């Protein structure tokens, strides 16, 4: 008797959906591609699509959402007695360390062809804000202040902005790009 569960393995289905979407965005543009077309190309149901992605725009970000999730989990695990900023820097760098040079979201490198420029700006802002919220919660906890404290919010948004700048420069660096963590480290040095 086989112990294999029915259906595709979860990681394969997610990757298949991402690949199918990228192909369709390149062929038809982002705006002209429907979720039903993506599911059909990937060979999955519409329900399966929504098991992995809450919205079509989630397909644009590849590793970024997972990196924010890792950052949130790791920041919660930091000892409250540790100095906030060095711990924040180390945790951010650890969260992006496994993102290889081959994992650049196509939506960022192929914005014109895919027609994703407006959507990456819009959905990117959501990710920027989520990351800033995660960082603000950490800083507030470490410093014993309110999460809406001006200094906490200023630091959190400066750091989130630096990370966004690093992602942008990394994505646009082309075939000569270095690991993302190098760009993030340089951007964090600037703030």
Label each region the model flagged.
Residues 118-143, 150-157:
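Amphipathic alpha-helical packing segments from all-alpha helical-bundle domains
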Residues 47:
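Key DNA-contact positions within bacterial/archaeal DNA-binding proteins
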Residues 4, 28-30, 50-62:
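HTH DNA-binding helix-turn interface
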Residues 1-28, 32-44:
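Basic, helix-initiating cap at the start of DNA-binding domains
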Residues 69-110:
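Hydrophobic alpha-helical connector segments
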Residues 99-102, 142, 166-174:
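Secondary-structure edge/capping motif, primarily at the C-terminal ends of alpha-helices
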Residues 106, 137, 148-170, 182-191:
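Hydrophobic alpha-helical segments that form the core
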Residues 17, 55-60, 70-71:
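Short amphipathic alpha-helical segment with a characteristic S/N-K-E followed by hydrophobic residues
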């Amino acid at each position: 008797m086989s112990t294999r569960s029915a259906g595709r393995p979860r990681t394969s289905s997610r990757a298949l959906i991402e690949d199918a979407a990228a192909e369709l965005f390149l062929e038809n543009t982002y705006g002209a591609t429907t979720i039903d077309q993506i599911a059909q190309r990937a060979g999955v149901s519409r329900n399966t699509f929504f098991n992995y992605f809450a919205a079509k725009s989630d397909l644009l970000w590849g590793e970024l959402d997972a990196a924010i999730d890792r950052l949130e989990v790791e920041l919660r695990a930091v000892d409250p007695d540790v100095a906030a900023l060095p711990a924040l820097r180390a945790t951010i760098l650890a969260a992006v360390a496994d993102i290889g040079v081959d994992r650049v979201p196509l939506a960022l490198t192929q914005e014109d062809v895919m027609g994703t420029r407006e959507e990456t700006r819009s959905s990117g802002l959501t990710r920027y804000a989520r990351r800033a919220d995660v960082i603000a919660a950490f800083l507030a906890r470490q410093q014993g202040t309110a999460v809406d404290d001006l200094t906490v919010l200023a630091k959190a948004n400066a750091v989130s902005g630096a990370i966004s700048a690093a992602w942008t420069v990394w994505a646009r660096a082309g075939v000569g790009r270095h690991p993302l963590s190098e760009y993030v480290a340089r951007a964090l040095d600037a703030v």
